[in-house]
Each structure stands twice: as structure tokens, then as C-alpha cells.
């Protein structure tokens, strides 16, 4: 399998990773699209326009540069963007944004990133924004699971052993598991990418999270008192 695949912006299913250990489907929508599974979480990003997200419990109106996560069926009306379906996972329901202009976390080679939808627990999927300043020639690297991306601003290249791919706003792509790649920007252009990860090695666990760590019993964190922790 090549390191990288890219897709034209068209309504509907773009790529089916259902047989992966982290089963995932990639969609684009333009105008209207229904997502009906009640056994999935839908991560989405609004690329252009304004979209109404209809759910069984509530309706939401989102604009360009906003993002969402829903763990039940949704209907999208208006605008256009991408939806990544993580099959068999129940995430949180949330909306956020607009995406900022720079990341809150330092990454590699001068790049930064932000967790837009963080893992609720260790191992969960997450949605990120990745920011490349001008004149970046990133260190070549791989990832142990797929990365589903969309260019939301600026321009650059994804460099792979097979070829170099031009990146511009609206480009949708997948970097496949263990695919060797790096990103480049010119001296005149920044680049911002939305990136979905189907798993993580980061996040809270039952024995280590802010609520239990900062609950103090006679000077000792409840995280260290096994007999009172919820079983």
C-alpha cells in the first residue's frame, strides 16, 4: 500500500477502512448527508459555509472552521466538510471552534498542534489541528495507525517515497499505517491541517485523572488509596 492517498471533494463515502483494527470510514458532504449508525461516533469539520446538524435530541448550527463529535445518528444540512466515522466507539457529543491560528502544543521541526477532540480515556480516538509555519522541511516519519486529514488553510507538500503531493485548501487525504512521509512548506506559505487519529496512547485512566488525583484524604491523594477507589 502507498504511504498516501488523496481524494476529490465529492459527496459521500471516500474511503472504507472497516476491516482495520480501528474501523473507520471517511466521508465528504456537500449540501445534505445522513449518518445513521447508532454504533459509531462521527468526527466532523466544517470546511465552507454554514451547516445545521440535526440530532434526535438537539439541533446545532456551525460555521466554517468549527468541528464536532457525535455518538448517535446525525443529519447535516448545508455547507461542506468531512466526516470521519469511528465504528464501534462511543465518544462524547460536542461542538467546538473556530480552529485557532496556532497550536497549543509543540510538535516537531517548528510545528505545533492542538487537540480539538481529545481522548476521553486512554486509547480513544482524537481529532487534531496541525500547524506548519513557513519554510518547513519536516523530518520523515511514520505513524502506527492511519491519519485522516484535510487541508484547511495555506499550502505545501506531502513528501513520500512514491512521489510528492501538492496540498491546498480542501484537499482530503489519508496517510496509511506505517507510511513514510513528511510535510514541506515554502518560504511564503503556512499550512494548517485537520488530522484524525483512530487511537491514542494518551488520556486519563481510572487510576489517574484530575478528579481522583486531586481528592485528598488526610494528606494523601485518593489515587493512592485503593480501598476507597470505585471498583
Model-found features: residue ranges?
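A short glycine-rich, His/Asp/Glu-containing loop-to-beta-strand
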Residues: 2-42, 102-137
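Short, low-complexity cationic-aromatic patches
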Residues: 32-45, 72-78, 118-122, 136-146, ...
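A short beta-strand-loop-beta hairpin characteristic of the jelly-roll/cupin
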Residues: 36-64, 148-169, 179
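Hydrophobic, ordered structural segments
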Residues: 44-95, 200-201
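Conserved metal-binding segment of the jelly-roll/cupin
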Residues: 47, 61-77, 132-135, 160, ...
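Double-stranded beta-helix
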Residues: 80-111, 186-231
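Activation on folded, globular domain regions of eukaryotic proteins
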Residues: 114-115, 138, 150, 156-157, ...
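A mid-sequence, solvent-exposed acidic-amphipathic segment
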Residues: 127-145, 149-154, 158-162
Amino acid at each position: 500500500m502507498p504511504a498516501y492517498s488523496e481524494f476529490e471533494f465529492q459527496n459521500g463515502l471516500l474511503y472504507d477502512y472497516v476491516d482495520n483494527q480501528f474501523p473507520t470510514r471517511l466521508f465528504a458532504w456537500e449540501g445534505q448527508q445522513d449518518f445513521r449508525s447508532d454504533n459509531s461516533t462521527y468526527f466532523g469539520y466544517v470546511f465552507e459555509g454554514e451547516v445545521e446538524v440535526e440530532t434526535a435530541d438537539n439541533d446545532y448550527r456551525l460555521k466554517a472552521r468549527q468541528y464536532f463529535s457525535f455518538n448517535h445518528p446525525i443529519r447535516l444540512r448545508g455547507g461542506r466538510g468531512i466526516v470521519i466515522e469511528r465504528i464501534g466507539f462511543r465518544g462524547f457529543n460536542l461542538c467546538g471552534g473556530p480552529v485557532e491560528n496556532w497550536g497549543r502544543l509543540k510538535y516537531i521541526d517548528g510545528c505545533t498542534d492542538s487537540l480539538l477532540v481529545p481522548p476521553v480515556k486512554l486509547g480513544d480516538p482524537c481529532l487534531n489541528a496541525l500547524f506548519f509555519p513557513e519554510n518547513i522541511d519536516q523530518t520523515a516519519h511514520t505513524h502506527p495507525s492511519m491519519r485522516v486529514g484535510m487541508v484547511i488553510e495555506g499550502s505545501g507538500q506531502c513528501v513520500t517515497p512514491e512521489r510528492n503531493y501538492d496540498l491546498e485548501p480542501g484537499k482530503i487525504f489519508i496517510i496509511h499505517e506505517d507510511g513514510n512521509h513528511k510535510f514541506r512548506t515554502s518560504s511564503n506559505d503556512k499550512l494548517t491541517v485537520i488530522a484524525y487519529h483512530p487511537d491514542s496512547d494518551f488520556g486519563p485512566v481510572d487510576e489517574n485523572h484530575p478528579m481522583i488525583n486531586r481528592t485528598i484524604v488526610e494528606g494523601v491523594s485518593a489515587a493512592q488509596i485503593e480501598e476507597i477507589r470505585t471498583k
